[in-house]
């Protein structure tokens, strides 16, 4: 469930191992944290936890550290360098941050210590997520009017932007729900901003949008990792945002749609199930299979492209198989303890209980399902085709496959790795035109 640079493997780039209390960065903490990161990046996994606090040492075994390190490299590319830890304030909390440079995507390590300078927080996130949340002012969009619209969440407001067409309205509106990982409201991936592309072009076509920073981006330091679920990551904030959007005078409350991308698309039927007032659902690159099944496919394919050994790939596949068996036998009332791939078992169990295709089949909402033919993360044959087969004959359901487009609905690259996302591009105009036409053709609910 990372996308990881965008994506489907939550374990990898969003590795949240603890939810520390009050950080106290000091010389001893800095020394311990730097030594732990050096041991980890050099493959000395049995030495990483020398200065871990008991709460972390019990979760991050040498084998778990080895496993996550392999996942990071399979998704972010080969490791290049480790920077020095430096004090930072994230979400109102003092921590230590060091940059990790990989061939395909930059990451950041975040270290937190307790009062005894023992490491009680150790996580890795996309480098962009440690940048200040207060970004530069929203650039003007020709033919549109944008204004700030924060979305309420239990951890605090999520910065958001409402983009309206020029004119009086009320307008049909689309709520943009991002994929897995800590994403800003533009769903920024390298130099690309797919959600900003959608907001700008849809406004010109007469459709309003609301996009917002994810909770994992805006308030990462406040998240309780032990209790974190996929509804906390996606569903609940999307429902709050949809209600807020429908309340705006410039928006037609009977024509509010949800557009989900990747994990956001996987959760779109669940969002529609919980808010029957929505006018329809738009799924971009929607996984039809369980996320761990997709992760296993990614481990094989990305591992081969990254020149991992057969033994390394097999070990990663076996770990995923063991996790699948654990979740299949788990009691939802008593989630397994511990974590997998850096995420708590409660989170994995919440994903295991998502049955997006079955929920979609029972829904009466109009649906538009879009897929890039060059997507190496969500499969055009194993996922998109499954949606087509399962929903064949379902009323008010439309499908579009776009040959040559990537997971971001931009021109697909040649490497079939996340390195392709570092090439500047924009969401294909045909995709946006199809979305706008479909939205405007749907009746008010």
What is each of the regions a protein language model found here?
Residues 129-169:
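N-terminal cap/lid segment of alpha/beta-hydrolase-fold proteins
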Residues 244-302:
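Primarily recognizes the serine-hydrolase "nucleophile elbow" in alpha/beta-hydrolase
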Residues 30-31, 35, 46-91:
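Short solvent-exposed beta->alpha transition segments
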Residues 376-382:
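Conserved alpha/beta-hydrolase "acid-adjacent" motif
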Residues 280-362:
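Accessory cap/linker subdomain of secreted extracellular hydrolases
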Residues 167-201:
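Short, surface-exposed "cap/lid" segments of acyl-processing enzymes
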Residues 227-249:
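Alpha/beta-hydrolase active-site loop
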Residues 363, 369-371:
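Short beta-strand/loop motif that positions the catalytic acidic residue
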């Amino acid at each position: 469930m990372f996308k990881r640079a965008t994506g489907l493997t939550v374990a990898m780039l969003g590795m949240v191992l603890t939810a520390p209390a009050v950080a106290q960065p000091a010389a001893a903490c800095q020394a311990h944290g730097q030594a732990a990161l050096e041991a980890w990046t050099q493959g000395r996994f049995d030495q990483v936890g020398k200065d871990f606090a008991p709460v972390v040492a019990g979760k991050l075994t040498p084998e778990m550290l080895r496993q996550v390190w392999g996942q990071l490299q399979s998704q972010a590319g080969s490791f290049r360098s480790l920077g020095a830890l430096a004090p930072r304030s994230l979400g109102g909390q003092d921590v230590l941050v060091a940059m990790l440079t990989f061939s395909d995507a930059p990451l950041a390590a975040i270290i937190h210590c307790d009062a005894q300078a023992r490491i009680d927080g150790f996580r890795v996130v996309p480098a962009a997520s440690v940048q200040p949340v207060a970004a530069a002012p929203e650039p003007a969009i020709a033919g549109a009017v944008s204004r700030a619209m924060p979305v309420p969440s239990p951890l605090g407001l999520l910065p958001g932007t409402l983009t309206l067409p020029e004119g009086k309205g009320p307008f049909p509106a689309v709520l943009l729900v991002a994929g897995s990982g800590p994403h800003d409201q533009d769903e920024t991936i390298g130099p690309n901003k797919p959600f900003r592309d959608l907001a700008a072009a849809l406004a010109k076509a007469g459709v309003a949008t609301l996009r917002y920073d994810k909770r994992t981006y805006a308030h990462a330091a406040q998240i309780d990792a032990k209790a974190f679920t996929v509804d906390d990551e996606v569903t609940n904030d999307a429902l709050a945002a949809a209600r807020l959007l429908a309340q705006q005078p410039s928006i037609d409350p009977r024509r509010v749609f949800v557009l989900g991308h990747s994990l956001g698309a996987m959760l779109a039927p669940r969002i529609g199930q919980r808010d029957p007032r929505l006018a329809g659902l738009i799924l971009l690159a929607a996984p039809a299979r369980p996320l761990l099944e997709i992760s296993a496919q990614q481990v094989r394919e990305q591992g081969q492209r990254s020149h991992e050994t057969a033994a390394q790939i097999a070990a990663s596949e076996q770990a995923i198989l063991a996790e699948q068996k654990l979740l299949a036998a788990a009691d939802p009332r008593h989630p397994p303890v511990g974590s997998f791939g850096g995420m708590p078992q409660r989170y994995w169990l919440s994903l295991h209980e998502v049955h997006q295709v079955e929920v979609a089949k029972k829904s009466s909402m109009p649906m538009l399902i879009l897929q890039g033919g060059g997507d190496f993360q969500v499969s055009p044959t194993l996922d998109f085709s499954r949606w087509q087969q399962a929903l064949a004959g379902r009323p008010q359901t439309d499908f579009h496959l776009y040959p040559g487009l990537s997971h971001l609905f931009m021109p697909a690259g040649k490497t079939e790795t996340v390195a392709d996302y570092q090439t500047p591009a924009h969401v294909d105009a045909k995709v946006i035109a199809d979305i706008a036409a479909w939205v405007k053709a749907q009746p008010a609910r």
